[in-house]
């Protein structure tokens, strides 16, 4: 429903901090949110056509304090259950030998998440991006003995099994195709909290999926800054979040043109021949 760029639904009147309006907000006054235009930060081109109207109506109902009817009884909106976020994209490993799997309570809990789970493939992809990724990669390495490529796995519910090529799945940049609960901002690590659930075994667990993309943190900062400014709320939280940005390792730097460049990269100049 919402792209990774974090869509902000704002009224055209208050989009740029009342830069186009001469009226100043009255203290304590709560204005209704007029969802006439949809914008993506930091740009300001309207993109109404890309946002489902039900999303705008739900946000307006929530913001204005009216009765809210969820779009679905449970879980996030998934127009296509076979779309997966690039956050959990399968990454092929080369030259790694299978290692013994540590059978502890954590691993057994993860097995209960997979057993007869109709969303088994999504859960498996997510687990392969957690701290127990090496265990699952070792487990999948055994498929090569059956003359199947490493990227091919089989998911089974009861006696029905399906074959999947993890390199050819329908991946999308939409982060919220997963059960995202929030962000874990703990410099030098930035993780996404994802809820995994098995309706068959009634098992559920929240896992951390590490990410090295600072665009997620920057998008969250832009989101909170705009909403708090629109509602005339205290901006101390914005200052704290901004300070977090400087506490992450200087792997990436953002230039004035909002381009991501490696900090250790230096242009090489050719010597002039005499």
Swiss-Prot record:
InterPro entries, sorted: Cytomegalo_gL
Ranges that cross the membrane: none
Signal peptide: 1-21
Source species, domain of life: Viruses
GO biological process per UniProt: fusion of virus membrane with host plasma membrane; symbiont entry into host cell
gL betaherpesvirus-type domain residues: 51-251
Record's keyword annotation contains Transferase: no
GO cellular component: host cell Golgi apparatus; host cell plasma membrane; membrane; viral envelope; virion membrane
Membrane-topology descriptor: Peripheral membrane protein
Database matches in Pfam families: Cytomega_gL (PF01801)
Subunit structure: Interacts with glycoprotein H (gH); this interaction is necessary for the correct processing and cell surface expression of gH.
Identification of the protein by name: Envelope glycoprotein L
Gene name as annotated: gL
